[in-house]
Amino acid sequence: MLLKTDVASKLIEELNTETVFSLFGGKLKIDEGTVVSWIIMAVFLIAGILLTRGLKVEGKLSKRQLFIEMCVDKMRSFFHSVMGPDGDRYIPWMMTVAVYIGACNMCGIFGFKSPTKELNVTVGLALTSIILVQYAGIHKKGTKGWLKSFAKPVPIVLPINLLELVIKPMSLCFRLFGNIIGAFIIMKLIEAVVPVAIPVALSLYFDIFDGFIQAYVFVFLTSLYIQEAIED
């Protein structure tokens, strides 16, 4: 009973969004997840500037440039294989979201609260991704063709296809949020039972390996939705 109460209290504490500071006389409250997201963005911005300095188009390339190009090419090849050539225009977005979610899930290693533990963050990510999916369909088929696609392959499936407009973002949102929170609950249960050694190893697993898996699943499903939206 004590273990259950302790884990429940820690879960409630983790789910609570603490206001770090306020703007405009307290009307706009900035919570911890937002601040951590800003830190992640700032780190990526600085890293991007530093890593892309002195890049060459021809001649002898540095090991740094070769490594960066290899990583980008691997990611581009992956998304291209899922979405096809018509989806290449959306690859930069997919790569950005993948790196951002991966970093959010990993920031617990450094003592920060993961922004993906906040439902409003996962809702925002899911909504922007689904809006991109619908935009891809409209861009490829036109507004009239996009509307007609809801009645394919037969008109009777129209209600189901319309329902997917709600189901898909909810699925993306709660899958990411639920897996991150689930990992947190498992870690707290293990820490309460075996407080030494094992929790450290599992923490690295959930913060690094599982964090990357969740980022992969999110962008993979989004790329599949885009592929479905742009296919003839």
Give names to the regions the model predicted.
Residues 1-232:
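Selective transmembrane helix interface/packing segments
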